[in-house]
Amino acid sequence: MCGISACLNHTNNSAMTSVVNALTKLQNRGYDSAGICTTSNGKFNFVKSVSDDTNNAIHYIKNNPLANHHCSIAIGHTRWATHGEKTIENAHPHFDASGRFSLIHNGIIENYDQIKSMLVESQNYQFYGQTDTEVAVAYLSYLLSENKTWFDFNESLKGSWAIIALDKFNPEKLYFMRNGSPLIIGFNETNTKAMIVSELSGFDSDISQYCIVGDNDYGYITNNNDKYIIKSQQHYQMISMGKIVMDLTPSPYKHWTQREIYDQPNAIHSLITERIVDSQLFFPEFNTINFTLVEHIVLLGCGTSYHAAQIGRRYIREFRPNITVDVIDGADFEETDIPKSRNTLLILLSQSGETKDLYRALVIGKQHSLKTIGIINVENSLIAREVDTVLYLRAGRENAVASTKSFTNQVLMLFMLALKINLSLDNSQLDYYTMSLNNFPIEFKKIIDQSVNEIPKLLEFFDNQTSCFILGKFGLEWIAKEGSLKIKEISYVHSEGYSSAALKHGPFALLHQNIPVVLLANDDSYFSKIENANSEIRSRKAKVIFITNKLIDNHCTDYLIHINTKSPLFHLLCIVPLQLLAYHLALSKGINPDYPRNLAKVVTVE
């Protein structure tokens, strides 16, 4: 769950600049620590840094003189800690004892403990840190000293890896090796510049062609008559690079989280205008799927995507009731979850398209010949390339760890998918829903504007509070869980989301005087149940924040947010005040909401 970058550029010696810029764009993959390295005059020049409460590691790297060093070759790494604490010793790059190799790595070497024991016992090797990567570079050095090769190195590792290495004895070659973890090689138009990155967004704007390194491949990039070429075990056809426009700062907003919350109406508009054409739902991808044969759907997601999948389950069950639907956390999906005698469709939801647990589930599905659909935000990502059908979210890049606009577009995509395959709606009902969708960006913007004005009062309820509850019924239960996740993620306030009916079955014991409880309620047949919960909670002197589209007496609750809408997507509008509450709670505690502790946006380990 790390970001790696490397560059060869002999024309203007700006390799280090490219690497540092790439790391800035790859912070979504982790930011516990970071490091950069180059080689010259037979030695490595490097710097490492660790994130602290003041700044993240990339900030310290960018302010080090080495970040502006002129060189033709450089590598860089931003880390999410899996083996070993976030310390300078455990930060990448790592070096072997002889000082020959500098190596960076994304993934997990599963047999590193056995290799480490062998090196300690047979070579009396002294390790300075606790990472599997340090073991890998030590083992590489050992194998080559024993007249072994990179082939032997590749064959003897178990797990997943994307490795880049510098060799002091071959200072103009950039070595790479991949199995399971993503690795992409790109060139500029004249092949006078080469880059290796974890994802396409890490490339400089002048990279015009790329290839995705195949599993179990290894090799190097080298200079051949002033043009860089790939020498490896597999042959690659270069893919033309589309234009990637990526801002490096959240300007004019202070944080990416804030910008992405405010950008949701635009993201919604982009998705809806692609999927509703001439007032008709437009899914040409479904021409290859015969939904009349589909008997069962399994929706898979992790974290925020899991919450979106649960809401999508309700849509499909409502509009296509003859299809049964399960929602399973991608990390928990097993072969036994596939019905033996039913035609099953697998739908995978992932912002990044690289979620390791989901990719494992995809492999299982393909082994059982299931049809697969990916609902993905990042184009041409790992899962997007390997599913049978991909539906892109068109939410634009998310930089903040906490997902906002991708969640909104995931829910909308599932809503439109369910409408498209429906068996229960007539034309007038479909027209009503498509009209509601077309109006939704405007409604969403209104709720953002309204919620901003509510925030100062909401924050008062959280003064000196370390916990809160968010409750909803039916589809709003999963909005409650998503809002609760946002609060936990970026403000470090302990928050739990439940069905409003579940509170009295245990969690009620945690209520105490003044604890904030957010109630989400639609003006429907469940409203009276929410009113009962409101009374029960207030009788324990907890403070209730009521978010609803029904006009009620202000005296019935401690604080009322009335969302004036009859939209069938009211439940999705309820996420807005919760997202903004999480953001402003983080600010009130002096926390950078974009990069919460211990988290990474792209989860590429199991």
UniProtKB/Swiss-Prot annotation:
Catalytic residues of the enzyme: 2
Pfam families cross-referenced by the UniProt entry: GATase_6, SIS
Root EC class: transferase
EC numbers on record: 2.6.1.16
InterPro entries found in the cross-reference section: GATase_2_dom, GFAT, GlmS/AgaS_SIS, GlmS/FrlB_SIS, Ntn_hydrolases_N, SIS_dom, SIS_dom_sf
GO molecular function annotations of the record: carbohydrate derivative binding; glutamine-fructose-6-phosphate transaminase (isomerizing) activity
Start and end residues of each Glutamine amidotransferase type-2 domain: 2-224
Domain SIS: 282-427, 458-596
Pathway: Nucleotide-sugar biosynthesis; UDP-N-acetyl-alpha-D-glucosamine biosynthesis; alpha-D-glucosamine 6-phosphate from D-fructose 6-phosphate: step 1/1
Catalytic function, reaction form: D-fructose 6-phosphate + L-glutamine = D-glucosamine 6-phosphate + L-glutamate
GO biological process, one term: UDP-N-acetylglucosamine biosynthetic process
Keyword Iron-sulfur: no
Record keywords: Aminotransferase, Glutamine amidotransferase, Repeat, Transferase
Chain's role: Controls the flux of glucose into the hexosamine pathway. Most likely involved in regulating the availability of precursors for glycosylation of proteins (Potential).
Protein's UniProt name: Probable glutamine--fructose-6-phosphate aminotransferase [isomerizing]
Protein source organism: Acanthamoeba polyphaga mimivirus
